[in-house]
């Protein structure tokens, strides 16, 4: 069983990037997980190339920064491969800061690497973020997930702070909930800046972050939330000169079915064009663009191989395969949100 693409049957067996899966099965048995590292680099290079081309084509003045979400996959070989291609890093928990420390100790990142700190900030998480500041990491950006986080952060350090704000979004119409638990309400951000952040001499607001669960998709819902975020960015920029970056949370989609189609070039061009258009309309400078890609970075690089132990025909239409592990255990994230994935046999192609 294979949950990836770029796999072709040769000699009655499926291969992955021209590598024999049968060889691995014969050597290691099943089940096992594999990662094809070159695919990670391919994905990063593709996104960087398309954003930089769109920036050049639109005579866009801001820069582009690709961030890898460490929570997506913590395996050292995966993160090291991503870092080989010049990514910056996004964290969402105190555990991720330990990982950041280890990467720095090994020389894999520098103190100039952008570190975007998202998520709810526990005391331990805040303490570790402050620890990075105290050790003179230059591009630490804690993103405020609620209005109270800034006071909790300032109580821990006398250092100057460069921060972001996360804008809460409305969920898709078919969602079970109307709002997101993360971020500050869009209608409250301007007032929050005026009444709170603007009065803090040691605080510089650099980034507006918004995250759409569906990812960057060509839908009315996505473009509606996107344009709302751009309007708030423009209004903020007019009263906050230090605001120079917009962070597009929610990644690019990956191939999860054999008929997958997505025009990456068009969507990235539209993202850049829309930002430039709003900036021209509002008379503001074009911001740097940050993206946070986790699943997009690694999702097409890995596979899990199972053995079918028994096939059970339970009625005329349903044939069940009993496998030698559990989807709940091996792909809990995909399993829990009913995510689709490619499933292919390795043998019996002829």
Description of each model-found segment:
Residues 20-22, 26-51:
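An N-cap/entry alpha-helix motif that binds or orients negatively charged groups
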Residues 65-245, 254:
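Active-site-proximal beta-alpha core segment in soluble small-molecule metabolic enzymes
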Residues 213, 246-256, 291-295:
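Glycine-rich beta-strand-to-loop/alpha-helix junction loops that act as flexible
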Residues 223-246, 258-288:
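Catalytic cores of soluble, metal-dependent hydrolases
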Residues 270, 276-280, 284-350:
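Charged (often Lys/Glu-rich) extended helix/loop segments that serve as interaction or gating elements
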